[in-house]
Structure formats: structure tokens, C-alpha cells
Amino acid sequence: MPPLTYANYLDLEKLLTLQKPRSTPAEHDEMLFIIIHQTYELWFKQLLHEFEKINRDFSAGHLFGAIHTFKRVRTIMKVLVAQVDILETMTPSSFSSFRDRLETASGFQSVQCFVCAFLASAATLNFITVAAAALGIKEATS
């Protein structure tokens, strides 16, 4: 087995071949579009991983661990929002130059995005309920 390197630990050889523009010839901004959306999906995967930890921490009564992980989730969400700034550097005409090749594909089809939104709202409600109970606040839990 070869020694562990940055490239083989991250499987960069495979990762960097996953961007497959459909336009011919390739439209320049299509690569940006693909990478932004693949990055979103990777962050969604990480958020799901973090929500699992929050759930485990709550179930075990580790409120401080859950709070720490919530802070990480918040930071990841800030990154997701900031990525919109990069996407907005693409002009409408640039996007329309390859949009038809995407056929019916849309970011609204992201299952991970919907699961993250659902878990974020459920985790927040669970956090409020547990924190309120720990503080003896009944109004927040009724």
C-alpha cells in the first residue's frame, strides 16, 4: 500500500474528475456552476453528520456538546449563504448559455437540502425544549 498523502487521503484523482460539463464546447461558467453545487452537496452531507451528533448529544443529556455542534452548524450555514456571492458572479446570459443542457435538473431536487432544512428546524425545536426544561421555563415547551 502506498504511503498516505494529501491527494490519496482525499481521493483527489477521483474528486477532480467529477465535474462533467454538458455543453459542447464547454461554457466557461458551467464549471463554476457544477463546483458550487457539488460543494453545496458536500456541506449538506457534513450538516447531516453534525445533526446526527446533536441528536446523540441530546439523547445522552450532553447539552454543552450539542451547543458546540450547533455553533458549527451555524458556521457551515454562513458558508453556504456566502457561496451565493460566488454564484452571483455568473451573469444571466452566461447561465442561459448552458441551462438548456441541464434539462429538468434543478437544485430544488436536492434531497439532502430538504433533509437538512427539516433537521435544522427539528433540532432547533428540540434544543429550545431541552434548554427551557433545564432552565425551568414552562412557556417555551407548551
Locate each region found by the language model.
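Surface-exposed peri-terminal alpha-helical interaction modules
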Residues: M1-S142
